[in-house]
């Protein structure tokens, strides 16, 4: 992500009027604060439910994909508890920082951690979806590509990277000696840091995800043309043909389920970039054009785009759970809703699943 080098986007709204806010701008700030409070409430409630559902459901907890979703929910939860409340605080006190400089650095560091960790979690989920479609029999092998242990290791690497990268300004790569100046808490980062962060934490993951979904599209096209079944037949010749042939018969059904899961992940990815792309583009424009561009844009625009970015943390939980039966069943149990005692076929189908099948529960 990209950030302004001398102040956060939302505090730029206050710099347009030295003698106080106009009536219309003051009203906009109040409305923005109300919307942000609503986003915080929904983001905390929704992501806590997602985390509780994954921890409380053995099938969800055993899925590598769901571990990535859990990590993404933690990112959104941290944003809603450690970053957004300070934005509300700033609006309520006319963008004057009334806390310590240490708390200012803690706020900006928390922001620098949560947003990149979200996009990197989305990247590893997309890579996992691509790999599951590229090698549909991976779940049946003795060692599938993405195991639970590997997923935990990847998640740890994502968080370590995000934390270390966010701490670089605190450790010395600063724009100026102090983060609090003129009673404002500023993002004390250099232009070079912002540009590097843009490439590593936004542009590169975006291009990588585009690559993965392009490959997924090509796999789907090959399936429709019948090319993929030939490759499966060849694989069945080379390793345990008798065993694989029985499982290959179920390949198309599993492929459809994995493809549906990939589409649902794509919706989550699209929502993230829809919410954060405008904020990032505006930040880059302000970095390369200088502060003179502030006189050419509406004063409400920076805070409005930041609000749109924060909205993503509240949108994700419904996107995770809308098409997932395990989530719905877990929520029903949590809230005391009982399922109708019918559907014997579904029950028998579930018991027919092997333990390896159950580890492949995805967003469907």
Report residues per predicted region:
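Cytoplasm-facing ends of alpha-helical transmembrane segments in multi-pass membrane proteins
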Residues: 44-55, 80-85, 113-137, 156, ...
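Class A (rhodopsin-like) GPCR signature focused on the TM5-ICL3 interface and adjacent 7TM helical core
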Residues: 43, 121-135, 169-173, 198-234, ...
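Extracellular TM2-ECL1-early TM3 structural module of rhodopsin-like
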Residues: 25-33, 61-125, 132-143
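Seventh transmembrane helix
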Residues: 204, 208-209, 274, 280-283, ...
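Loop architecture of class A 7-transmembrane GPCRs
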Residues: 12-22, 91-110, 135, 143-154, ...
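Extracellular N-terminal segment of 7TM GPCRs
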Residues: 1-45
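Helix-to-loop junction signature of class
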Residues: 36-39, 53, 78-94, 108, ...
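Intrinsically disordered regulatory tails of 7TM GPCRs
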Residues: 1-20, 141, 224-262, 267, ...
């Amino acid at each position: 992500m990209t950030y302004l080098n001398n102040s956060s986007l939302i505090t730029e709204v206050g710099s347009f009027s030295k003698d106080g806010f106009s009536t219309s701008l003051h009203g906009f700030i109040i409305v923005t604060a109300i919307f942000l409070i609503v986003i915080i409430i929904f983001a905390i409630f929704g992501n806590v439910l997602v985390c509780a559902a994954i921890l409380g459901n053995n099938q969800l907890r055993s899925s590598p994909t769901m571990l990535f979703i859990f990590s993404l929910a933690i990112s959104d939860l941290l944003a809603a508890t450690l970053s957004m409340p300070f934005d509300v605080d700033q609006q309520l006190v006319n963008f004057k920082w009334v806390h310590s400089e240490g708390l200012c650095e803690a706020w900006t560091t928390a922001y620098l951690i949560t947003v990149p960790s979200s996009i990197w979690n989305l990247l590893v989920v997309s890579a996992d979806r691509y790999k599951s479609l590229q090698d549909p029999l991976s779940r049946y092998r003795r060692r599938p590509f993405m195991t639970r242990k590997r997923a935990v290791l990847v998640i740890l690497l994502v968080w370590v990277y995000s934390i270390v990268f966010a701490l670089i300004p605190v450790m010395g790569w600063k724009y100026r000696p102090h983060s609090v100046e003129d009673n404002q808490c500023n993002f004390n980062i250099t232009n070079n840091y912002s540009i590097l962060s843009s490439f590593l934490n936004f542009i590169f993951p975006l291009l990588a995800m585009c690559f993965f979904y392009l490959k997924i599209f090509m796999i789907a096209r090959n399936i429709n043309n019948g090319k993929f079944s030939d490759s499966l037949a060849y694989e069945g010749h080379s390793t345990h043909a008798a065993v694989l042939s029985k499982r290959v018969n179920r390949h198309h059904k599993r492929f459809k389920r994995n493809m549906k899961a990939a589409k649902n992940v794509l919706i989550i990815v699209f929502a993230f970039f829809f919410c954060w792309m405008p904020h990032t583009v505006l930040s880059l424009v302000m970095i390369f054009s200088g502060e003179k561009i502030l006189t050419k844009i509406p004063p409400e625009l920076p805070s409005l785009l930041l609000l749109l970015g924060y909205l993503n943390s509240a949108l994700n939980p419904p996107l995770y759970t809308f098409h997932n039966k395990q989530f719905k069943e877990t929520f029903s149990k949590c809230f005391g809703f009982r399922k109708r005692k019918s559907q014997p076929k579904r029950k028998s189908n579930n018991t027919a699943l092997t333990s390896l099948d159950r580890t492949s529960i995805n967003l469907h």
